[in-house]
Amino acid sequence: MADDLGDEWWENQPTGAGSSPEASDGEGEGDTEVMQQETVPVPVPSEKTKQPKECFLIQPKERKENTTKTRKRRKKKITDVLAKSEPKPGLPEDLQKLMKDYYSSRRLVIELEELNLPDSCFLKANDLTHSLSSYLKEICPKWVKLRKNHSEKKSVLMLIICSSAVRALELIRSMTAFRGDGKVIKLFAKHIKVQAQVKLLEKRVVHLGVGTPGRIKELVKQGGLNLSPLKFLVFDWNWRDQKLRRMMDIPEIRKEVFELLEMGVLSLCKSESLKLGLF
């Protein structure tokens, strides 16, 4: 026992055995914290968190707002207007108003006053109860006498202006009861050249002409049709096409009508040798 106690017993202890328990405890805690930091797995972002949150969320809303705005600002269609109110027959005031609107940006104020037509140059308008034959009989009761006295070529006694060639053929078929033995000429561009119509007007006497304003204007311009003997100019005013448009609702037709009126029609109306009718 004495020999054992005499030895330097602390030298034989293993390394770290002499350290205080407090020190060992502190070092152990530090090591565990480092190990925990190294071993804790870093959370991997999921597929949902990788995608930006604002993607494709705002743009569809803006598109919906834009579509609603354009719907609010859209122009009224003719079908919308007709659905709310019954169609009204055309009146001379309607033609006068269209003329003022058309020439307001092209003429001076003094010149616009010269375009005003007296009420005496207008015939009774169609009240939407007439067929074409019955309307023509009402506005021209002495047609047979006029037809017999007409012998001048390159001219007609009555012009009926419509919007298309198809409509012109319909009008020609519907006026059989009125025209009698009167000669009718088709005045439109479909399948008929201008020169062929000029030669036809030069060869024979014609009483009635039915066609589009563009072709009639071209014939007058080329000297194939003389408007001086003309007594009646009737507009196919109230008829509507598949899009429910009247002839004066179509910009191209409206422009050609006013250009034709300037080629001597207005002066004939003011001299009271020509009457205007709205069918």
Curated annotation (Swiss-Prot):
Acidic residues compositional bias, start-end: 1-10
Start-end of Polar residues biased regions: 12-22
Gene3D superfamilies hit by this protein: P-loop containing nucleotide triphosphate hydrolases
Secretion signal, residue range per the UniProt entry: none
Residues found modified as Phosphoserine: 19, 24
GO molecular-function terms, A-Z: RNA binding
Pfam families, sorted: CMS1 (PF14617)
Residues where Phosphothreonine is found: 212
Alphabetical UniProt keywords: Methylation, Phosphoprotein
Disulfide bond positions: none
Protein family according to the UniProt entry: Belongs to the CMS1 family.
Name of the featured protein: Protein CMSS1
Originating organism: Homo sapiens (Human)
Species classification: Eukaryota, Metazoa, Chordata, Craniata, Vertebrata
Gene that this sequence comes from: CMSS1
